């Protein structure tokens, strides 16, 4: 009878490479040898060429997804195929609906969709979750978040608190940061000179988060001011501050489509589509250098959508979720489509060189009373993380006794 100890190193690595990422934690406990392989992240070369693993939001549920682009752009005229294998996650995700998700370093920060909004951080690799108690102010529907880490690899959560004081007739914006090591929130002394739209989720890179933002201008009732173009803005989790404005590779204004995505932990990608209905081109750029206060861009793709869907086709300016495959020279853009007055669906548009466009339907999507639903959100390829985020026992009790 063959024992696990009898298996060759190559065979073990091949077996482990086929384990779903959401099941890695359970497999690690099988034996010490397998656990060591996982800790060293020794995965076979076959995995490097396999379809990448990602997470996607669908019907307010977090799902795992393998988006197989093999066969796309066949030059021999053969049948194209795209296999977006989507599987709803089990565990505690069966009990809650999720409205927003943010990721960094293999950790997922989830915002629940319920009257009493909650935050939870999940490490899919270790199978650990951690509920994040709010600070002095309860979580609100339009709060914005980012997750990252500092130079000491200490993980933190940034929170934007935006609210309107009707007595003062003024909108306030405050920033808080949560430190995993101290299990507490702190208010940051930041006087924003910029505005970041609520639908801009940002992109994580090297522990920091980058946003599309515009200069903040105080408008007078009778005054007329030109609308400032958007810029790139980085939040540094080490200094716990925002940097200076950095250039985007295009002029982006309100109602233009603009979104960011990260490529592993090395590059940013930016998607742009002008809001002018006479212009239907989609542009994607990739950074060649990305630091807190320095950035440079190279063009990646430019595709005209008019020949396929007409001049009026526009991606959602409040969505813009996408990822790219540099090797295949492809981009996959996620879209919330209105297929009728009462029917909505999630879809992806695969775009490539020489005007290539292919739509892949992902199924029906829910709509709320206003007809608006956050579109599907997909992240770059997931990389397992060994970051421990076990729930701190007694933390909630300590807060209640304060």
Curated annotation (Swiss-Prot):
Superkingdom of the source? Eukaryota
UniProt cross-references to Pfam families, sorted A to Z: F-box, FBA_1
Domain named F-box is located at: 1-56
Concerning Gene3D superfamilies, the annotation shows: 1.20.1280.50
Q: Which CDD domains match?
A: F-box_AtFBW1-like
Q: What name goes with this protein?
A: Putative F-box protein At3g20030
